[in-house]
Amino acid sequence: MGGSSKTVRKLEVATPVPADIDIANAVEPLHIADIAADLNLSPRHYDLYGKYKAKVLLSVLDEVQETQDGYYVVVGGITPTPLGEGKSTTTVGLCQALGAFLDKKVVTCLRQPSQGPTFGIKGGAAGGGYSQVIPMDEFNLHLTGDIHAITASNNLLAAAIDTRMFHESTQSDKALFNRLCPPNKEGKRTFCNIMHRRLKKLGIDKTNPDDLTPEEVTKFARLDIDPDSITWRRVMDVNDRFLRKISVGQGPDEKGMVRETGFDISVASEIMAVLALTTSLADMRERLGKMVIGNSKAGEPITADDLGLGGALTVLMKDAINPTLMQTLEGTPVLVHAGPFANIAHGNSSIVADKIALKLVGPGGFVVTEAGFGSDIGTEKFMNIKCRYSGLTPQCAIVVATVRALKMHGGGPQVVAGKPLDRAYLTENVGLVEAGCVNLARHIINTKAYGSNVVVAINMFSSDTEAELNAVKKAAMDAGAFDAVICTHHAHGGKGAVDLGIAVQKACENVTQPLRFLYPLDISIKEKIEAIAKSYGAAGVEYSEQAEKKIEMYSKQGFSNLPICMAKTQYSFSHNAAEKGAPSGFILPIRDVRGSIGAGFIYPLVGTMSTMPGLPTRPCFFDIDLDTTTGKVIGLS
């Protein structure tokens, strides 16, 4: 089928490139029904959220099941500077090129940004320049309420944990059981549906509460949660460093049930990772129920279903499972869905959005999705976690590179967010670029190992010179890239990524290998960790005493067959953010090991990970305001 001829908008680009919000505000978005119609979606396939957003219903998949999938493209990058190298911008620019200039059916699949960093240091995540998702204020704030649903679900579970411990501390086994299974007016007791899951887990094959022995009553009614083992924390979608460590239960009515806990940012919740990795409503119900919140004092894992909550959480999340349809500046469709952390989770948008998109574009169409952080983290997790659960295979993997980042990897001065760039980054230095290309080469070699064709997108800045750009192209081709293309989509929109679009099309059409995972699932947790560490260039792995204990615990509990999601710095292949280039021969330290059992992965912590960001001295919110005459948002970046 042809391209998005009905909805394509040609941009009038200005030089120098105006602020992102000014570009976004200058373009009148199309009604989302027009974008939907171009994907052959009829009104029964989606729910409108205002004029520019719609939730695409999962039921669409039933109708398009027989359609052949389009091409699947993942966008990763080299090890970034703190300024970012433009993965989101490249993802959007490429899709604008494919849809608006190369007449292809295309859908962009992106993560939903967290509101916290939008007001903090990072700003928004809608792309930039003339490659953006619009309306950008709606994209960056609230969207269709998915993160609010995650916050509500997460905190309901947190409340249930503390309350259950409180009630168990003040009641006998018999009193607990009587309240959990109260008799009806006829004096008859029954188990509600979710209780049958707990009975099955305990190996109690009885359907009548009155048939339970006193021992079975105790086992069923008393979860006996070990407070020191609780891993579930409360969340909110605000950067608030003062909530990182708090104590709860200080009130006079809580009978001294005080414990230390803390808040994470909402997108760090396991429920967000569940949303991203789920394949259907039924699958989401199972994953939410399997989430482990801690252990009993006997060392047994306690789940959301044990607390009686799996069904209620699914009800709170039932609309959040539907991806949100939006558009780019040039009128090509975007599915925004899920935004898990890229360190303690896998940092990719949802499986269901990708599956819907691949059917909607059909054979010869393109679905382009972005993987958070550099390819060592984002693309690795995309392949070994996301593709393992989805069963999908990408034909092409893009590695976004900038001259700026390569100069840093070649030994250039430190790049610090919020500080002016050193002169080395603004003047020609081919030697510095060439030295830094060891980083690019390792990303290409690692990504190629999965079986996809690798295309390097060189995101060009105005200070880059021809000699520097040519050095990057040569290094990319020498390392085994399928192609390496210079792009100017930030300054020119889709027009600036046409060559990239052509290269990606050729790469997809010429893929010859199946997807190869880095490790099988049936080896030990340690063997999987070591396989990933080897891809970083590590000579070995060192485990803390805590990590050893946790690996033993998760293996004993039956979770050793899960994939591994490494939580490490994005600023180096190694655990040390200051080590640039392509370090090797180092020992990777594993400080702790945790599990997102419902989402379906074990995550080792390499170093310290903050799951609740703070605000800088001058947060982005200083610049954000509303034009009260037009109702337009100003200053959002």
Curated annotation (Swiss-Prot):
The keyword Ligase applies. PROSITE patterns: FTHFS_1, FTHFS_2. Keywords: ATP-binding, Ligase, Nucleotide-binding, One-carbon metabolism. One of its GO terms (molecular function) is ATP binding. Homodimer. This is Formate--tetrahydrofolate ligase. It is an enzyme of class 6 (ligase). Gene3D superfamilies: 1.10.8.770, Formyltetrahydrofolate synthetase, domain 3 (3.10.410.10), P-loop containing nucleotide triphosphate hydrolases (3.40.50.300). Signal peptide: none annotated. The keyword Chaperone does not apply. The lineage of its organism: Eukaryota, Viridiplantae, Streptophyta, Embryophyta, Tracheophyta. Pathway: One-carbon metabolism; tetrahydrofolate interconversion. It catalyses: (6S)-5,6,7,8-tetrahydrofolate + formate + ATP = (6R)-10-formyltetrahydrofolate + ADP + phosphate. ATP binds at residues 81-88. Belongs to the formate--tetrahydrofolate ligase family. It holds the Pfam family FTHFS. GO terms for biological process: tetrahydrofolate interconversion.
